[in-house]
Amino acid sequence: MSGCPFLGNNFGYTFKKLPVEGSEEDKSQTGVNRASKGGLIYGNYLHLEKVLNAQELQSETKGNKIHDEHLFIITHQAYELWFKQILWELDSVREIFQNGHVRDERNMLKVVSRMHRVSVILKLLVQQFSILETMTALDFNDFREYLSPASGFQSLQFRLLENKIGVLQNMRVPYNRRHYRDNFKGEENELLLKSEQEKTLLELVEAWLERTPGLEPHGFNFWGKLEKNITRGLEEEFIRIQAKEESEEKEEQVAEFQKQKEVLLSLFDEKRHEHLLSKGERRLSYRALQGALMIYFYREEPRFQVPFQLLTSLMDIDSLMTKWRYNHVCMVHRMLGSKAGTGGSSGYHYLRSTVSDRYKVFVDLFNLSTYLIPRHWIPKMNPTIHKFLYTAEYCDSSYFSSDESD
């Protein structure tokens, strides 16, 4: 018999028929439609009827419907929803710090994860400007006249966010020569005043850094040992440079050394730190700065790994807030040029003045890189201290309940 020997069932194999899409055997259709039995459904849970009908075009109410006003409203509403989520995360983190739950180091992971979430949201908000920029200046001008006197400066949630993170009130740029709170009335003004009186994230982080293990003068005494090591290291560096033959290169190295010496030794001048603090050029207390630098230097130690992640997240948030302000400035400049804003401000010129270190909260963390030193200058740990930094601290033998930790 000629032909393919594999045809038929010559080898005694049993071939199973594969299920055909749409047949009774299609597993993709074996679920149960529970919504058909009543109860909470998607639209009701999210209150979509309210959310999706909250776009009232002012141009349309004035009888001149402008297409791009819808995009303008949607984008700003999305911003406000994300601001609400950021405030939700920020308030929860502040509560953990305020209630002392952060003393149980197991809660630090929760703090870090929530602050990281805030930074991821801010990344999205920075990118969101690109959607608004699909609208041209002429498109915006078509409906801009209908917006006055509404202004982005009147965003209550953004001002609350600034206050709760820790933007210093005396560092704010006046808005038309008036206090920023003068633009808010009634309950909104009271909420802002209350947020100014509450503990900020900056203050809570500062108190936490002041408790950094290893700062104790009668313990590891990190600061005392660091000063001693830096002083000795600078002396050795100066001797090395002086041993070189006279040359232009040597003169440059001596000049560079003197600058480095001045910067590093300024670390141990507490009066200078207090002076810079009073001017607003530094934000953290002297002891908190010591704690931050210790975490920075020993970030690879198990006990400092999560705290270092928190410091990194705080810097990310500060950077992203600055990027958000900068992108906002660029967009306003593109849309308005140098015209006044709809709320009466100087527009681009006012916004440009807010893109500076005046509005940075954790500027001291960025400046830690100023004090980088060779690794062999960092104080070595004895076995006892090294073991200590392998041990986390906790308040009791069990995790907090959801009521306490949420």
Swiss-Prot record:
Record EC number: 1.13.11.11
SUPFAM superfamilies, per the entry: Indolic compounds 2,3-dioxygenase-like (SSF140959)
One GO term (biological process): L-tryptophan catabolic process to kynurenine
Family stated for the protein in its record: Belongs to the tryptophan 2,3-dioxygenase family.
MF GO annotations: amino acid binding; heme binding; identical protein binding; metal ion binding; oxygen binding; tryptophan 2,3-dioxygenase activity
Enzyme class: oxidoreductase
Reaction(s) this enzyme catalyzes, per UniProt: L-tryptophan + O2 = N-formyl-L-kynurenine
One GO CC term, this protein: cytosol
This protein's UniProt keywords: Dioxygenase, Disease variant, Heme, Iron, Metal-binding, Oxidoreductase, Tryptophan catabolism
Source organism (scientific name): Homo sapiens
InterPro entries (UniProt xref): Trp/Indoleamine_2_3_dOase-like, Trp_2_3_dOase
Effect of H76A: Abolishes enzyme activity
Protein name: Tryptophan 2,3-dioxygenase
Effect upon mutating Y175G: Reduces enzyme activity
Residue positions binding substrate: F72, I73, I74, T75, H76, R144, T342
Phenotype when changing Y45A: Reduces enzyme activity by 99%
Pathway: Amino-acid degradation; L-tryptophan degradation via kynurenine pathway; L-kynurenine from L-tryptophan: step 1/2
Binding site for heme: H328
Pfam families (UniProt xref): Trp_dioxygenase
